[in-house]
UniProtKB/Swiss-Prot annotation:
The name this protein goes by in its record: Methylenetetrahydrofolate--tRNA-(uracil-5-)-methyltransferase TrmFO
Keyword entries, A-Z: Cytoplasm, FAD, Flavoprotein, Methyltransferase, NAD, NADP, Transferase, tRNA processing
Upper classification of the organism: Bacteria, Bacillati, Bacillota, Bacilli, Lactobacillales
Annotated gene: trmFO
Residues making up the signal peptide according to the UniProt record: none
Cellular component GO terms held in the UniProt record: cytosol
Pfam families hit by this protein: GIDA
UniProt entry tagged with the keyword NAD: yes
SUPFAM superfamilies on file: FAD/NAD(P)-binding domain
Cofactor annotation: FAD
Top-level taxon: Bacteria
Source organism of this protein record: Streptococcus pyogenes serotype M1
The protein's Enzyme Commission number: 2.1.1.74
Annotated catalysed reactions: uridine(54) in tRNA + (6R)-5,10-methylene-5,6,7,8-tetrahydrofolate + NADH + H(+) = 5-methyluridine(54) in tRNA + (6S)-5,6,7,8-tetrahydrofolate + NAD(+); uridine(54) in tRNA + (6R)-5,10-methylene-5,6,7,8-tetrahydrofolate + NADPH + H(+) = 5-methyluridine(54) in tRNA + (6S)-5,6,7,8-tetrahydrofolate + NADP(+)
Length: 448
């Protein structure tokens, strides 16, 4: 198929990936037609018509370079990511993590793109894969049915999917502050989380209520398949008590403060279990329950989650919900630049490609956007080094075993190993990987 001669590039979908792709293309002097159906047609999960809306957590996760997602964010900053820049401008306290005021952040991304002289925003649903120009499809896991059918046809009609869930959000003014305490795990960063401590007796009662609570039904023909990184809390609870105690209710590093007078097990300095609440907006009036994505019926959420100390009278401004995420057979369908193997004028980006997470989705949009622009200019494709996070992630999702392919977060395990003797200390090893990654990225960019 010959390269398109159109004078613009289409970007379909203005989520994190599409917003990033549109910006990267326009930054390179190429007109963009950015299509977004929200505002004309709603999705089950989105609450606004803003671009890059965060529908699950408000966290971009760890910010340290000894964390793979922290490395990926730093690489994206060096590539002038619109998502990272606006995220930084709308940060809220989150200890060692990067969390944002979700509304302020999405509004600022929307304003920047809508006011860009080379970006034409078109509100409307796309039901066919365009063939008029180079196109980046970034319609996300909530792709409309009509377009999803066309994309699934590329899979031979056998699309993949998993279920994703969001955690409840609570009005802070309804939290009993006498029963919670402010602290970040291991006192890392500023004290940013409200911690709801549980004794063993409280935890066991909570676990029993959670595992017996009624879930909202799935369609009869759909199996329950969850992404491990966003598993409903009730599913996790049914795997066993230790799954929660080593997961979202892990008490390690969250010792009681000296002035704590609430119930505790004997003289233990650390609770048996802890539920953490994280600030969800800049005003600090909303908090989400960390790791408590759920598919329980709303009445059951209220009943069970009000068993958490401090939340006995909590008001839920949003209950947890679950939705089906579709993703592609990327190892068979896409190249390392997220370009279609069968149609070189077509790129895909975001969670539909099998990357998992806000930052990873935006990163895929950045890679796809840059390479769509380079194709437009008839320049050689830019494949980032596998020693970098932004190079290793697209390499993984396009080279994984197709038969067992599942969505993947960025992690040090997919980045090319260091040469020479293995560094035993994990922190030092990750620091060395990050140092090499940033040096290699700078070298790559300097060669362009």
């Amino acid at each position: 198929m010959s390269q398109s001669t159109a004078t613009y590039i289409n970007v379909i979908g203005a989520g994190l990936a599409g917003s990033e792709a549109a910006y990267q293309i326009a930054k390179r002097g190429i007109p963009v037609k950015l299509y977004e159906m929200r505002g004309v047609k709603a999705t089950p999960q989105h609450k606004t018509t803003n671009f890059a809306e965060l529908v699950c957590s408000n966290s971009f996760r760890g910010d340290s370079l000894t964390n793979a997602v922290g490395l990926l964010k730093e690489e994206m900053r060096r590539l002038d990511s619109i998502i990272m820049r606006n995220g930084e401008a709308n940060r809220v306290p989150a200890g060692g993590a990067m969390a944002v005021d979700r509304e302020g952040y999405a509004e600022s991304v929307t304003a920047e793109l809508e006011n860009h002289p080379l970006i034409e925003v078109i509100r409307g649903e796309i039901t066919e894969i365009p063939d008029d120009a180079i196109t980046v499809i970034a319609t996300g896991p909530l792709t409309s049915d009509a377009l999803a059918e066309k994309i699934h046809a590329l899979n031979g009609g056998d699309g993949f999917y998993f279920y994703d869930a969001a955690a409840p959000i609570i009005d802070k003014s309804t939290i009993d502050m006498s029963k919670v305490y402010l602290k970040s795990r291991y006192d890392k960063g500023e004290a940013a989380y409200l911690n709801c401590p549980m004794t063993k007796e409280e935890f066991m009662a909570f676990h029993e209520a959670l595992t017996t609570a009624e879930e909202a039904p799935l369609n009869a023909f759909e199996k329950e398949k969850y992404f491990e990184g966003c598993m409903p809390i009730e599913v996790m609870a049914k795997r066993g008590i230790k799954t929660m105690l080593y997961g979202p209710m892990k008490p390690v590093g969250l010792e009681y403060p000296d002035d704590y007078t609430g119930p505790r097990d004997g003289e233990f300095k650390t609770p048996y279990a802890v539920v953490q609440l994280r600030q969800d907006n800049a005003a600090g009036s909303l908090y989400n329950i960390v790791g408590f994505q759920t598919h329980l019926k709303w009445g059951e959420q209220k009943r069970v989650f009000q068993m958490i100390p401090g939340l006995e009278n909590a008001e839920f401004v949003r209950y947890g919900v679950m939705h089906r995420n579709s993703y592609m057979d990327s190892p068979n369908l896409l190249t390392e630049t997220f370009q279609s193997r069968s149609n070189p004028n077509l790129f895909f980006a975001g969670q539909m490609t099998g990357v998992e997470g806000y930052v990873e989705s935006a990163a895929s949009g950045l890679v796809a956007g840059i390479n769509a622009a380079r194709l437009f200019k008839r320049e050689e494709a830019l494949i980032f080094p596998q020693t970098t996070a932004i190079g290793s992630l697209p390499h993984y999702v396009t080279h994984a075993d197709s038969k067992h392919f599942q969505p993947m977060n960025v992690n040090f395990g997919i980045i090319k190993e260091l040469e020479g003797p293995r560094i035993r200390d994990k922190k030092e090893r990750y620091e060395a990987i990050a140092s090499r990654a940033l040096a290699d990225l700078d070298t790559c960019l300097a060669s362009l």
